[in-house]
A protein has these predicted regions:
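Beta-rich ligand-binding surfaces for carbohydrates and other polyanions
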Residues: 2-473
Length: 473
């Protein structure tokens, strides 16, 4: 087991403007720039570069709200992603992307990206040869124009301003001020190439954050109304997030920790943290007013898979790496047996004083530690278990993520499945001590370095004062 650098997690103080990474592109348009609305029959063509350029973002702004900056703007965007160019319709608050048509499924194009509000009222994104990659599905519903409201809601309306389609009905990873999300709705992080992604879900009895890995789902944060009251919907106000019942009465509230009015709620694509944001006029950016999780080790991926997040917020490998894997910068999952089972093939490595932030997985109650370990070795989908000696509970995991160091007196024991014979020659007891002692040594070294540096600074300062007194006398 080797110590790693501290996890790459920082408090989310602000959003960096997207234009820092963008480039100017040539835009052909037919009805002007940033109108108050777009009428049916409108068509805009955004040129796509011939050669791929990493970090490229090109936008043509269509309509905007008449508010003090930062205001809402709708744009057609071409973005360089995974060696291709993605075409999308998006809404921005200042320079922060708050809605995107390609959040769940990207539309890749070459040569051009076309936005069209057809004469029969359908809003479409098209590529070469009129290939349609996204549409509103509002054909022949009386749609007359596209507007963006002061709330940031992008809407298609008919001649009497009845809404036929709205972006608020298709939430992505952001919830705006004034927006309402009903029970069974969720926000999701952008998946990208990873098999892991996060979600913020509104359930009948709670709101919760989830980690999704393949077909596996685990919660890692939740907030419940008192007295087991049921939730009907949530709404974001100026001073926090409100939870409401079926009668529209507020039953719980998550308050902002700043005086400035809130503008949006966001689910972090990298960390999976949930945060409320306000706009700082002095710094000219958005800053976090509240975060659901404030400790690195309480994040599901505060450390990489098969790493332990320690008390000092550093990451340590669980161990059992081959020589080839030790030479790599990443821990990897070494000899952890994924997809294997049977007592003749696998055994359990026991880590005392180690727990997990992941919840809601399968569990068994009133079982012994030995029974807990045996059930995992017999289950090919199980790679680890968390056993509580106090509650006699056994929690089963299909991933080794969200693992963190806990107090030994908590009575928690984390066990991972390894190939049979991995512990041979060391003995189970010695191997367990080896893993935990190394975690303790890493933390101890950090503490010694901090206090040693402080002592050195104080001694140097005292010597300088003594020399100054001698010179003056």
């Amino acid at each position: 087991m080797t110590p790693k650098n501290k996890p790459n997690f920082q408090k989310q103080p602000s959003f960096v403007p997207n234009y820092l990474f963008g480039f100017v592109v040539f835009v052909i348009f037919s009805n002007g720039f940033c109108n108050s609305d777009i009428q049916k029959g409108y068509k805009l063509t955004l040129a796509v570069p011939a050669e791929y350029s990493l970090g490229f973002i090109g936008r043509a702004f269509l309509i905007e709200t008449d508010q003090t900056a930062p205001n809402f703007r709708a744009a057609v965007s071409v973005e360089a992603v995974n060696g291709k160019f993605s075409c999308s319709l998006e809404v921005l608050l200042g320079d922060v992307k708050v809605w995107n048509s390609g959040h769940y499924s990207r539309f890749y194009v070459s040569e051009k990206c076309v936005l069209e509000l057809t004469k029969d009222g359908d809003l479409r994104l098209k590529g070469p040869n009129d290939r349609v990659g996204w549409l509103s599905g509002t054909s022949r519903q009386g749609v007359e124009r596209l507007q963006i409201l002061r709330t940031g809601n992008l809407v298609l309306v008919d001649v009497v301003n009845r809404v036929k389609w709205q972006s608020f009905n298709f939430p992505t990873d952001v919830m705006l001020w004034g927006q309402r999300l009903n029970v069974a709705t969720r926000l999701t992080s952008f998946r990208g190439n990873s098999t892991e992604f996060y979600s913020f879900e509104i359930q009948r009895y709670r709101i919760a954050l989830f980690l999704h890995s393949g077909k596996l789902n685990y919660s890692y944060w939740e907030f419940k109304p008192s007295k087991n009251r049921n939730i009907s919907f949530i709404a974001l106000g100026s001073n926090g997030l409100g939870l409401f019942n079926d009668k529209g009465k507020k039953i719980a509230h998550i308050y902002s920790q700043r005086l400035q009015p809130l503008r949006f709620l966001s689910l972090g694509n990298r960390t999976g943290n949930l945060a409320l944001y306000h706009y700082s006029a002095n710094d000219r950016n958005f800053q976090a007013s509240f975060q659901a999780i404030n400790k690195t080790c309480d994040l599901p991926l505060g450390c990489k898979p098969c790493e332990i997040c320690t008390f000092t917020n550093s990451c340590s490998c669980i161990g059992l790496l081959t020589k080839k894997e030790k030479d790599k910068s990443d821990c990897g999952c070494g000899e952890i047996a994924v997809g294997f089972c049977g007592r003749n093939r696998v055994e359990m490595l026991e880590l005392e004083g180690v727990g997990s932030v992941l919840r809601d997985g399968p569990k068994m109650v009133n079982v012994s530690k030995e029974e807990c370990a045996s059930m995992c070795t017999s289950d090919c989908k199980c790679v680890g278990v968390l056993y509580s000696s106090a509650e006699l509970e056994c929690f089963f995991y299909g991933v080794v993520m969200g693992v963190k160091q806990v107090e030994k007196r908590s009575g928690l024991i984390y066990m991972v499945k390894v190939a049979k014979g991995t512990q041979r020659g060391r003995g189970k007891r010695n191997l367990k001590k080896w893993v935990l002692i190394l975690v303790g040594v890493v933390d101890g070294l950090i503490i010694v370095l901090v206090f040693g540096g402080l002592a050195y600074y104080l001694i140097r300062r005292r010597r300088k004062k003594s020399l100054a007194c001698d010179n003056s006398s």
